[in-house]
Amino acid sequence: MPLNRFPCWRYAVACGLLLLLVHVHGQDSVSPIRNTHTGQVRGKLVYVKEGVTGVYAFLGIPFAKPPVGPLRFAPPEPPEPWSGVRDGTSEPAMCLQTDFMRPQISKERKIILPTISMSEDCLYLNIYTPAHAHEGSNLPVMVWIHGGALVMGMASMNDGSLLAATEDIVIVSIQYRLGILGFFSTGDEHARGNWGYLDQVAALHWVQQNIASFGGNPGQVTIFGVSAGGTSVSSLVVSPMSKGLFHGAIMQSGVALLPDLISDTPEAVYTPVVANQSGCEAKDSEALVHCLREKTEAEILAINQVFIMTPGVVDGIFLPRHPQELLASVDFHPVPSIIGVDSDECGWGVPLFMGLDHVIKNITRETLPAFLKSRAEHMMLPPECSDLLMQEYMGDVEDPQTLQAQFRELMKDFMFVIPALKVAYFQRSHAPVYFYEFQHQSSFIKNKDARPSHVRADHGDHVAFVFGSDFWGLKIDLTEEEKLLNKRMMKYWANFARHGNPNSEGLPYWPELVHDDQYLKLDIQPAVGRALKSRKLHFWTKILPQKIQELKGAQGKHSEL
């Protein structure tokens, strides 16, 4: 080759390589491919923040084998490898469930929600990662666990795109088995239960093994969740099975001590009901489990409809003892935590879900004593405690509307606030705890007829401000003040994922729950509060238990006679 032509040849090759690189980069930017331990997966590019910021979404990645056939009522197993490139551009099927939630949300928001298929084959996760992220980026990772009373919900309920793009973090949203498929227990080796919790552990193992390929740092993982998702996060904090799988925890309107989501016994309280509803004439637990494994998805759904909640159990493995015992004995992972509640946890949605909304509306001074007595029994309290509850929450009030409001306050404290405070006080001596009460009344609740005007922050209302979008990623119309609240909450949550501390320059200061029991009132103008519900905490943790012991002592003496 003549020497005078060599530079042209080299120039042509360089141009060709440049064009090839541009072409490959262009392909990657629209249709990214990432490696996992079990195969390659193709995602998609989505734009957020007025279409100027790109996020890669990888949807429906399997983190376990389909829990079907012999794997029904069994611990999850690692996923099978696949050849070729798996499509990760469409939402995964949600786990089998009775869909209580969607009609309620549609009515309240005045929106039409997308249809998502349902299957027992549902152990998948979604990943949202900034488009610039690559292996070695070492971005903080936040793993979202959806709520839904352990009977409903899905990974796709909350879209992590905007949070990932705004705060330059990796968001993972996981699914887990629900209802009886997720939590049925016979109390012995044939079906120990907590299958849904074991799914969550499996998902966290998958994150440790694979998230680096998506730009995440496996050594900087924060788990967060709402309602039953918060209960799940809190349960993972006390479970020996999750050691080393995460480094921070955020419990939003749910902790491991929520009364309806944990059973005191290894055998679930509803096991006889399952046996009866299933039509399984089984002589023992082994035969019952075998019979239930033979049921179709439709038959399982029919059994599920009986239950509005399915509690976890003390199985000796995921939960060696009751969460309260584990917390009291400091047998938990001492990771930094954010724990919080909404100001009107039982303002509307929870009573509606529990079928109590019409009953509450009919409360008067005359009907209240009998109603409180029946609720005390449901709360696993001696019926005689109803007088004490009446005295503490209602006093001499006669006005029906005030009585109804005070009953909702009682429900809120019993179900959410007191359990959250107890967990926070157990943990704060061993790791930083930041507590909040979300107080803002959202402007985007369209159907004011569906939700009473007196409700400020109902159960789960804060979630839209964490993700910057409504359910299923639907855009929300925020006021200018709400946009600032949204920006601040995203920053608090992301700061915590980065540093184990929500604070940074430019944000209202959020103190630890140490001096003067300080917490943050999350509203348009955040403010520091002190000793949230201190009197009620004393009532539920000191006065009421003492009264119960006195009643038991009196009953014991009576039985001796």
Curated annotation (Swiss-Prot):
This is Liver carboxylesterase. A motif (Prevents secretion from ER) lies at residues 558-561. Belongs to the type-B carboxylesterase/lipase family. It catalyses: a carboxylic ester + H2O = an alcohol + a carboxylate + H(+). It is found in: Endoplasmic reticulum lumen. The active site is at S227 (acyl-ester intermediate), E345 (charge relay system), H459 (charge relay system). Its EC number is 3.1.1.1. It comes from Mesocricetus auratus (Golden hamster). GO terms for molecular function: carboxylesterase activity. Pfam families: COesterase. Residues 1-27 form the signal peptide.
